[in-house]
C-alpha cells in the first residue's frame, strides 16, 4: 500500500538476526466490518499477475506488499474483467449478515476512487493495485478490464496477522479459504480486440412471443423474451427463464431461474447492454431420454424437464445502465442473480 495509508495497513516486522530475511505481517486496521471484508477479499484472493520467470506465480496483493515492490516489467499484461472481482466478492459474502454487504454505489467508489486527503482513512482498490501498474482498459465502452491481475482460489494467508484471519472467518462463517471458482483471464500483448471480448452474443437471435416466456422448447435453441412485468403462463416441469427484477435509487437487480443449466463458464454467458437489454445463453443438461448413473441406464418416463441443448433468455431492464458496472453470480441453487448500476445521466436526458 502507498505511504499515505499507514493507519489502514500496518507492516509488523518480526525481530530477526541480521543474517535472516525480515518477516513481515500485514495488519488491516479497518474499523468497519464491511470495509474490512471487501479489502481483505480483494487483497487476499487477487494479486499481480507476474511473469513466471521473475517470481513464483499467484502471490496475493498482501503477499507482494509484505515482500517487495513490483515494477511494470515483472507483470504479464493479462486482462481481467472488473466484474470478475466483484463476482468473487459477492460469492464469498453470500451468507453473511446483510449489514456486511457493500452497496453497489460504495463498491463502485472503492474501485474507482483516487487517493486524496479526504479519503485517507478509507481503503481503496488502488492501494492494492496502483493504476500505473494495473490500468483499466475499456472495450466498446461496455467492459472494464484491469491489467495484470490474477485470481487465487486457495490463497496463502501466512503474511496476515492471526487476528485478521480470525476476523474474516468470524464474519463470513468460512473455515477454509479455498474456493471452487474459476475466473476468466484474457492474455494480451497490450491490445484487446473487440471481437475477442464479446463473443457470446449472437445478434441474429430473435425473441419469441411473450406468451411463451418462461418455457423451454424442444428445438435446437429456445429464446425467452420478457418485459419486467411479464409472468410465465406455462405449467408443469422446471422452467428456464422465470425471472424477477428489483430496483433501487441507483441500480437494478435481476434474478433468473435456470434449473438444469450447466454452470461451466465455457458454456454459460450473461451480457448486459447499455440500453438495459440482458442476454443469457447456456446449455441445459436435463430432460434427456436416457440417464446413465453408476453403470445403470435409466429410461426417463415423464420427461417434463427442459430438453438438453442450447438456450438463450433475453429481457430488458426498465432503463439504461452502465454495462461495465455489472456483477453477477450463478449459484448452485440454479438462480442467476445480477446487479447493474443505472445510467442516471441518460435517464434524465
UniProtKB/Swiss-Prot annotation:
Residues 233-349 form the sHSP domain. InterPro entries: A-crystallin/Hsp20_dom, HSP20-like_chaperone, IDM2/3-like. Gene3D superfamilies: 2.60.40.790. One of its GO terms (cellular component) is nucleus. It comes from the Eukaryota. Disruption phenotype: No visible growth or developmental defects under normal growth conditions. DNA hypermethylation. Its main location: nucleus. The keyword Nucleus applies. It is found in: Nucleus, Nucleoplasm. Expressed in cotyledons and hypocotyls in young seedlings. Keywords: Nucleus, Stress response, Transcription, Transcription regulation. Induction: Not regulated by heat. Changing residue 276 to E: In idm2-3; DNA hypermethylation and loss of transgenes transcriptional silencing. Changing residue 260 to D: Loss of function. Signal peptide: none annotated. Residues 210-230 are annotated as: Disordered. Homodimer or oligomer. May form an 16-mer complex. Interacts with MBD7 (via C-terminus). Interacts with IDM1 (via N-terminus). Interacts with IMD3. Part of a complex made of MBD7, IDM1, IDM2, IDM3 and ROS1. Prevents DNA hypermethylation and transcriptional silencing of transgenes and of some endogenous genes. May act as a molecular chaperone of IDM1, regulating its H3K18 acetylation activity. Belongs to the small heat shock protein (HSP20) family. This is Increased DNA methylation 2. It comes from Arabidopsis thaliana (Mouse-ear cress).
